[in-house]
Amino acid sequence: MTQAPLEEVVPAEVFKAEVRSWARRIGVEPEEVHLRPMKRKWASCSSNGRLTFNTELLREPAAFRAEVIVHELLHLKVPNHRKPFRALLRACLAQET
C-alpha cells in the first residue's frame, strides 16, 4: 500500500460521500458504510449489505478509490467475480473516464 503525504489524505466524510455518489449512479443502497483498519484487504461487502473499507484507502488516489468503491458496491447486485460482474465493473468504471 502506498502512502500519500498527510495533506493528501481524504477526510472520512468525503470518502463516504464518494461511496454514496457511486451508489446512486449504480442504483444500489448499502445498509451501512464503515471505515476501519484492515490488514489484508482494501474492502469487504457482507451479505446483509454492510460495506467496510480500509482506512488506508483515504491515502490512495481518487481513481483507485473509485475502483474499490465500485467493486464493493457491485457486490450488492452480483455476489461473485464471474463474467457478468467483471463486465459491470468495466462498464461502470468506463463512465468515469
Map each language-model feature to its residues.
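Active-site-proximal or metal-binding-adjacent scaffold patches in catalytic folds
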Residues: M1-E67, L76-T97
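Walker B catalytic acidic pair
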Residues: E72
